[in-house]
Amino acid sequence: MMRRTLLHSFATLLLSLSLWSAAVMAAVTTQVTVVTNVAGALVTETTIWDPATAAAAATTTAQTGFFTTVFTTTNDVGTTVTLTQTVNRATMLPTTTTSTSSTGKTTTTVPTATSSLSSGLYLSTVTTTNDLGTTVTLTQTFTHSSTSATSSASSSVSSSVSSSGSSSSVKTTTSTGSAVAETGTRPDPSTDFTEPPVSAVTSLSIDSYITITEGTTSTYTTTRAPTSMWVTVVRQGNTITVQTTFVQRFSSQYVTVASPSVGSIGMGTLTGTVGVIKSAIKKTVSHNEAQHLGMSSFTSILGGLLTVLIWFL
């Protein structure tokens, strides 16, 4: 009798432990991560893991099954955005993308996705609408090798923006290749990379000016094209090239003025300011000679006569 009671108690304990472990495994796990972006704003990322959904996805076949990923985040203006994406296990491409936000914007998109399992080429296009009502299209092309984990990868990302109330230009970034080992003293951008700021960090003009002064009469200014800096990084096997524009400030400025004052004209030497032409020839008369020109001539003749008379005497 005692033995039967002990066996019954042991079985009850095992059943309770199994039910408790099942309840723990079935519990939904939520992970909250708070990071600071390059603009200095706090960004909260919430990841929800549901074991029941994972178990249901694991029971399906790898060729026809789907799994769903949910991302919830809060941007720097306080808008909560939830992105739900359904991925096909056969092609590992998204089939449906749904985005919702706290401002009431909801978009469900079926992306255009093609794949070639023989060559391992995947193409995915996702179109969504942000909180401002602007339609954004993201196209990604990448390669994947099932035999080598360190295969080369190429990435082509283009983003186009269009809306009824605004217009903007289209920017395209394309890169192909792999990272090159850094052998100098600078940090390797593939492992130590700082994100460029999303907005301007200075009020200086992007254009650089050159001022040229010729003598004291002609001054003109020319402009040069903006200077761009390219940074290449490798993330998860994809090579990404980022372009940014920078402005450099100089602490001092040097000015050189060429103004010659002496020059040679072959038969003689010209002194004074080069390039100045006088409108008339002028003569300067000194010692008040202009008023006593006749007296000057009489004095000269009288001096000559006295000299001849003294010679005869």
Swiss-Prot record:
Membrane topology qualifier: Lipid-anchor; GPI-anchor
Start-end of each Sequence repeat: 72-86, 127-141
Region (2 X approximate repeats): 72-141
GO biological process per UniProt: fungal-type cell wall organization
Region (Disordered): 94-114, 147-198
Ranges of biased composition (kind: Low complexity): 147-181
InterPro entries to which the protein is assigned, alphabetical: Kre1 (IPR031452)
Taxonomic classification: Eukaryota, Fungi, Dikarya, Ascomycota, Saccharomycotina
Main location: membrane
Keyword Secreted attributed: yes
Signal peptide interval: 1-26
Function: Involved in a late stage of cell wall 1,6-beta-glucan synthesis and assembly. Has a structural, rather than enzymic, function within cell wall 1,6-beta-glucan assembly and architecture, possibly by being involved in covalently cross-linking 1,6-beta-glucans to other cell wall components such as 1,3-beta-glucan, chitin and certain mannoproteins. Acts as the plasma membrane receptor for the yeast K1 viral toxin.
Gene Ontology molecular-function annotations: structural constituent of cell wall
Any one GO CC term of the record: fungal-type vacuole
Gene from which this protein is expressed: KRE1
Stated name of the protein: Protein KRE1
Changes after translation: Extensively modified; probably through addition of O-linked mannose residues.
Residue ranges of the propeptide: 289-313
Lipid attachment, kind GPI-anchor amidated asparagine: N288
UniProt miscellaneous comment: Present with 623 molecules/cell in log phase SD medium.
Family statement drawn from the similarity comment of this UniProt entry: Belongs to the KRE1 family.
Record's subcellular location: Cell membrane; Secreted, Cell wall
Keywords: Cell membrane, Cell wall, Cell wall biogenesis/degradation, Glycoprotein, GPI-anchor, Lipoprotein, Membrane, Repeat, Secreted, Signal
Any matching Pfam family: KRE1
